[in-house]
Amino acid sequence: MIVPPIKSQGIKTKLVPWINDVIDSSGLNLDDAQWIEPFFGTGVVGLNAPVKGHHIVGDTNPHIICFYEGMKNGSINPFSVREYLEREGKLLLTSKEDGYVHFREVRDRFNQEHSPYDFLFLSRAGFNGMMRFNRHGDWNIPFCKKPNRFTPAYITKICNQVASSSRVIHSG
């Protein structure tokens, strides 16, 4: 199963086998079928869909779309993600208030610049894997209070998720 790099509460990972069983038993020609998903979210369902034809995805969250568009055009890749997370992880680990000062810096930067890398960081460093925005569209989730969040193993896991998701995106 492809696990997406974006972390979010309520991810449908456990439903993917059931959804795919329903699709597989539908009798449709999956080689020519289209996959249309208006609420892509983290992408776990779409990235694992058995449909081989054209995929059309959307979401009301422009940051999700921007992140996956970056993966599609190659500007977001395992190497750039590793470089970013290693740098930001070190800053988080050495930041005052057990990392909270740096978390706020990234959050404030994201709210101004909307970087897909900052979006990924916040989805992984935010409390309980939640994703929420206030009425102004600003990130509105507190820090998970784990300054050592971005260990080498965790960064590798995220980079592997970027790589496997990218392969699916580029195969269609």
What kind of feature is each model-predicted range?
Residues 1-39, 44-45:
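S-adenosyl-L-methionine
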Residues 49:
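Aromatic pocket-lining residues of Rossmann-like dinucleotide-binding sites
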Residues 52-169:
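Class I S-adenosyl-L-methionine-dependent methyltransferase module
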Residues 172:
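A conserved short coil-to-beta-strand element within the FAD-binding core of flavoproteins
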